[in-house]
């Protein structure tokens, strides 16, 4: 039933992915050997969304792990849940992509892609009714961005009617891991706009801020950051895996969140975020969850929703709560902050309620919003891109792998178009839309 195939690529993707499987295994009561050690039938009822049941009652994740160098995969394999994955599903090269998008997309990655697709095919054939794919990757490096987008376009060709959801880590505004990040990210966005159905936009700086300010961690590690991401990833699919009063799935999410096909880049948030020591001092209520969930400080990407307007949003609650209260709170948010929602999409917040909360919490909520302010992310990357591209800095690394400058120009203009589209809908009002139509009618 409604399986989701998980794919992780590159160092970032594999580290997020490894953390994600720790969270999912914990929710479904699966131990590090793949045996079920849980205490509730609900954990098993739809465990097959993310797991295959192998011989001897072992649960094996429907996961494909790929990288162009063996390093990160070795550490996944030796990590806490490393033995749970199917050994054949580790696909890796030896050369590395060296933070070069062209290597990941055209040369090194292209050599490895067929063996990855074989594994994907094998996993898809094991599914009863595949719902879609979720891909974890970063856009700043070489493998996750270059090879990740190559894989997405290949899967698109082969499974055109399945959902394609990505968790994409964008380059951060202040912290840069790589000088050529703006190039890699722009080339990737150029692909994601065309080939992905839903992109959850993440970035490390926003995650650091959450760890630092809200969770009060003095020195946040990547492990802490990835744990935040995993909580959100688990929240997005909890309705598929546990019974609930109001269900959502990847396709419902897309239908409710995407008013125009290109505008499918979402901000995500999670509540409750409390610092490790202070959990036991407060009970959570739906109003508190709602308040934290819509808080700008809670967003996992460096764009401020107060600088734009929400086209649509979706709130996924988990735990025992009254749906009436959820509906009231959602209505309340829209009424109080009506200036932050576009008025030409009435009732633009979708909510869903799943009965089973995450481990250790009474209730929780995941937020996914389609806000025009996400253009800040693209605008920032685009400015950095233009600054380097104008001088043709670092281009020889890409042209040397057979890329053409034209492709850079196309990617740049596609990204600028995307920013312009977001801006256009941010400024649009209900009345002027109507006037446009009248003028068109007269012109005809």
Swiss-Prot record:
GO terms for biological process: microtubule cytoskeleton organization; mitotic cell cycle. Its main location: cytoplasm. It is found in: Cytoplasm, Cytoskeleton. Mg(2+) binds at residue 69. Induction: By gibberellin. Down-regulated by abscisic acid (ABA). InterPro entries: Beta-tubulin_BS, Beta_tubulin, Tub_FtsZ_C, Tubulin, Tubulin/FtsZ-like_C, Tubulin/FtsZ_2-layer-sand-dom, Tubulin/FtsZ_GTPase_sf, Tubulin_C. Pfam families: Tubulin (PF00091), Tubulin_C (PF03953). SUPFAM superfamilies: Tubulin C-terminal domain-like (SSF55307), Tubulin nucleotide-binding domain-like (SSF52490). GO terms for molecular function: GTP binding; GTPase activity; metal ion binding; structural constituent of cytoskeleton. Expressed in roots, leaf sheaths, and suspension cultured cells. It comes from the Eukaryota. One of its GO terms (cellular component) is cytoplasm. Its cofactor is Mg(2+). Belongs to the tubulin family. Dimer of alpha and beta chains. A typical microtubule is a hollow water-filled tube with an outer diameter of 25 nm and an inner diameter of 15 nM. Alpha-beta heterodimers associate head-to-tail to form protofilaments running lengthwise along the microtubule wall with the beta-tubulin subunit facing the microtubule plus end conferring a structural polarity. Microtubules usually have 13 protofilaments but different protofilament numbers can be found in some organisms and specialized cells. PANTHER family: TUBULIN. This is Tubulin beta-7 chain. It comes from Oryza sativa subsp. japonica.
